[in-house]
């Protein structure tokens, strides 16, 4: 073949290749156009089908507020939706999917430009997802006022008022323990003065769960004021038992049993109880809808994914409200200093199994009487290792009976024995479940340890499991019980066994999850001392809540919240009332002050008889002291006081001597000054004066 022929053939082949190439490109473009057309048509059909199904579904559900999804074909700019950051339909975009147009460009400029639009769209989606507050009506003048009466600046005693100008609800009514030195005071309850002021607009008391620090004050409140009381069955069951003890059975007529996931109207509020995990059965968070916006109150909580009853926190409902837009979150701060997550209640089981398996004698397990899951687990392992179960302690027996009767737990009755039957069984066949984990002097465990219990004393071979942590303020009491148990040579499993107790409160990672689910505009950390709520504030800031949208409250503070603002508007009288738990009676503040005075400075008592004419003490006058000096020195002290009074009477005028009240005050003032000069303290003075 010649060179010319070769060139001609190459030219012909090149022309044919070029023609084939152009035909291939035309075919590819046609196929691309047809594919895009089919894509749009299918997407439109799917959207129409989805609209039809959605509309039919909403008709069945009777939810008129839900509008059919017609976003694929907006008729007017006002109909554009923010759903999935979709502002408009481009030629190459169908329902959140964009096709690439710059397929054959030489570089990547157009391709990257299209990708960048996708990045911007997804960023917009994320921003709106994290901040759904645009759904709130910022022009609304409605607001709510939050007033904590207990539970802030302290551990326990939780009580809070949420109110509008015309309506109010009270969330929880709990008790707390007194500090050392409040002699004869067993529990503290919130001051109800503010409730008396607003009683005409209180629509109800809302209970989150049945722990004592949330329900312990209810009988004392109902002795003064009565309102509808809303709660889940266990909460109302335990409150009802308290009412029986206080002679308030008739007030059960105020009880309202609620169902979770079912919003109800209470005054001007719409409230939904949302299942939450905690260290007691049937705990709830609250979704409170108001004209100003939605409020979420977590109650006490942790996020337990493997709870004993297999009923985890209802994260869906929390997220549901978060997507709708939440104005205010009030969240549990108790464990705000604890990093990570709180272990599941179910992690206790292996430790119990090991301890019960290895125990040679009796097993005595003490925990909070309200921690029914903990008690239930202990009893199950007692049964597993063929032990008879003795439940000892009034509150423990009561709570367990109520939980069984209501169907929360199921246990064979034949496994249980009474306290007076324990001695009939070998030690390795007995489990005693009892109260006293906080070292209470009247508890069953304390009385066993001090040989004061009628039927049971601690033996050297006993294994005592204290499955609880000391509440702040109770450390000394718990230590005292531990000392008694160890002196009895019992084996004690307490804090060195980290896996026999877990907290019921959320640690930092769970608090973060709650904040991310709810995405509140404003945040009020609750439940804890000031250092706890301050640490919770830092966690909230890390989760995107602006610092200016967070306020740290104390008991008595009044904070007003609206869609566009949060501010402190005042302070009301708050404080504590004292209760003698043995008599179930309140103790006047003045009595507590007198007891403190006597404890710190002692008492001096004087009953004097005066001869007015001689201006002298009669021999029948009597003096005594307590807590000032020892018995040996008391006579010398009394002689000093008598001598001083003789001098005082000689210089007293007739007006004082003839008026018993003035004579008594005159004598008291002299004794008070004399004792202060001698001891540099003011003892309590008991003085009676008579003149003849």
Curated annotation (Swiss-Prot):
Family: Belongs to the metallo-beta-lactamase superfamily. RNA-metabolizing metallo-beta-lactamase-like family. Bacterial RNase J subfamily.
Location(s) in or outside the cell: Cytoplasm
Organism (species): Helicobacter pylori (strain J99 / ATCC 700824) (Campylobacter pylori J99)
GO molecular function: 5'-3' RNA exonuclease activity; identical protein binding; protein homodimerization activity; RNA binding; RNA endonuclease activity; zinc ion binding
E.C. number: 3.1.-.-
KW Ion transport (keyword) present: no
Source species, domain of life: Bacteria
Protein name: Ribonuclease J
Regulation: Catalytic activity is regulated by the balance between homodimers and homotetramers, with homotetramers being the active forms of this enzyme. Acetylation allosterically regulates the homooligomerization state and hence the catalytic activity.
CDD domains per record: RNaseJ_MBL-fold
A family per Pfam: RMMBL
UniProt PTM comment: Acetylated on nine lysine residues. Some of the residues are acetylated by multiple different mechanisms. RimL is partially responsible for the acetylation of Lys-324, Lys-398 and Lys-650. HPB8_1270 homolog is partially responsible for the acetylation of Lys-324, Lys-398, Lys-512 and Lys-650. Acetyl-phosphate-mediated non-enzymatic acetylation pathway takes part in the acetylation of Lys-135, Lys-324, Lys-398, Lys-512 and Lys-650. Acetylation of the remaining residues Lys-141, Lys-338, Lys-548 and Lys-635 occurs by a yet undetermined mechanism.
This protein's domain notes: The first 132 residues are not conserved outside of Helicobacter. Important for protein stability. The C-terminal domain is required for homooligomerization.
Record's GO cellular component terms: cytoplasm
Cofactor section: Zn(2+)
Transmembrane segments: none
Function as written in the Swiss-Prot or TrEMBL entry: An RNase that has 5'-3' exoribonuclease and endoribonuclease activity. Degrades 5'-monophosphorylated ssRNA and dsRNA, considerably more active on ssRNA. Association with RhpA significantly increases the dsRNase activity. Degrades RNA substrate with hairpin structures at both ends with low activity, but presence of RhpA significantly increases the activity on this substrate. Stimulates ATPase activity of RNA helicase RhpA. Involved in stabilization of mRNA but apparently not rRNA.
């Amino acid at each position: 073949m010649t060179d010319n022929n070769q060139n001609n053939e190459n030219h012909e082949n090149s022309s044919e290749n070029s023609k084939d190439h152009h035909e291939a490109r035309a075919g590819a473009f046609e196929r691309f156009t047809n594919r895009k057309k089919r894509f749009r048509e299918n997407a439109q059909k799917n959207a129409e089908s989805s609209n039809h199904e959605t509309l039919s579904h909403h008709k069945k559900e009777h939810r008129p507020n839900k509008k059919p999804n017609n976003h694929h074909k907006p008729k007017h700019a006002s109909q554009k939706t923010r759903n999935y950051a979709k502002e408009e339909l481009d030629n190459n975009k169908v329902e959140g999917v964009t096709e690439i147009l710059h397929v054959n460009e030489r570089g990547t400029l157009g391709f990257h430009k299209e990708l960048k639009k996708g990045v911007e769209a997804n960023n917009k989606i994320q921003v709106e997802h994290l901040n759904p507050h645009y759904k709130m009506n910022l022009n609304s003048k409605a607001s709510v006022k939050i007033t904590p009466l207990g539970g802030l600046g302290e551990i326990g005693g939780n009580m809070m008022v949420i109110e509008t100008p015309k309506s109010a609800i009270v969330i929880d009514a709990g008790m707390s323990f007194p500090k050392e030195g409040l002699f004869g005071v067993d529990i503290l309850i919130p001051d109800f003065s503010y409730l008396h002021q607003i009683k005409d607009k209180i629509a109800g008391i809302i209970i989150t769960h049945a722990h004592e620090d949330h329900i312990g004050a209810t009988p004392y409140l109902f002795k003064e004021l009565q309102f509808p009381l809303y709660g889940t069955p266990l909460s109302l069951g335990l409150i009802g038992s308290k009412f029986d003890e206080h002679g308030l059975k008739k007030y059960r007529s105020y009880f309202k049993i609620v169902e979770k996931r079912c919003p109800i109207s209470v005054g001007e509020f719409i409230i939904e109880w949302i299942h939450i995990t905690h260290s007691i059965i049937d705990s709830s968070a609250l979704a409170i809808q108001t004209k100003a916006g939605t409020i979420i109150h977590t109650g006490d909580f942790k996020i337990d994914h493997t709870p004993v009853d297999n009923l985890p926190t209802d994260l869906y409902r929390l997220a549901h409200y978060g997507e709708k837009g939440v104005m205010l979150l009030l969240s549990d701060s108790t464990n705000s200093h604890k990093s990570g997550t709180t272990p599941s209640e179910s992690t206790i089981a292996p430790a119990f199994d090991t301890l019960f398996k290895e125990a040679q004698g009796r097993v005595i397990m003490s925990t909070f009487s309200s921690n029914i899951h903990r008690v239930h687990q202990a009893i199950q392992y007692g049964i597993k290792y063929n032990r008879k179960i003795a439940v000892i302690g009034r509150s423990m027996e009561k709570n367990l009976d109520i939980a069984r009767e209501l169907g929360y737990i199921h246990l064979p009755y034949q496994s249980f024995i009474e306290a007076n039957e324990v001695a009939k069984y070998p030690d390795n066949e007995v489990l005693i479940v009892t109260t006293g984990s906080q070292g209470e002097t009247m508890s069953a465990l304390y009385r066993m340890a001090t040989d004061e219990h009628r039927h049971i004393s601690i033996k050297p071979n006993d294994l005592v499991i204290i499955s609880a942590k000391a509440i702040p303020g109770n450390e000394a009491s718990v230590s005292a019980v531990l000392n008694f148990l160890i002196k009895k040579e019992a084996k004690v499993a307490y804090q060195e066994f980290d896996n026999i107790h877990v907290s019921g409160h959320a640690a930092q990672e769970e608090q973060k999850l709650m904040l991310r689910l709810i995405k509140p505009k404003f945040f009020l950390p609750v439940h804890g001392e000031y250092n706890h709520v301050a640490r919770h504030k830092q966690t909230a800031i890390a989760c995107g809540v602006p610092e200016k949208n967070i306020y740290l409250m104390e008991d008595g503070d009044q904070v007003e919240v609206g869609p566009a603002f949060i501010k402190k508007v005042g302070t009301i009288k708050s404080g504590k009332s004292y209760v003698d738990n043995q008599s179930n009676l309140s103790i006047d503040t003045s009595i507590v002050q007198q007891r403190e005075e006597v404890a710190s400075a002692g008492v001096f008592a004087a009953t004097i008889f005066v001869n007015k004419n001689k201006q002298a003490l009669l021999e029948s006058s009597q003096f005594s002291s307590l807590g000032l000096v020892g018995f040996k020195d008391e006579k010398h002290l009394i002689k000093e006081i008598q001598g001083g009074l003789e001098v005082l009477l000689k210089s007293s005028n007739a007006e004082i001597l003839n008026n018993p009240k003035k004579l008594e005050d005159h004598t008291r003032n002299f004794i008070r000054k004399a004792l202060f000069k001698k001891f540099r303290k003011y003892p309590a003075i008991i003085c009676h004066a008579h003149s003849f």
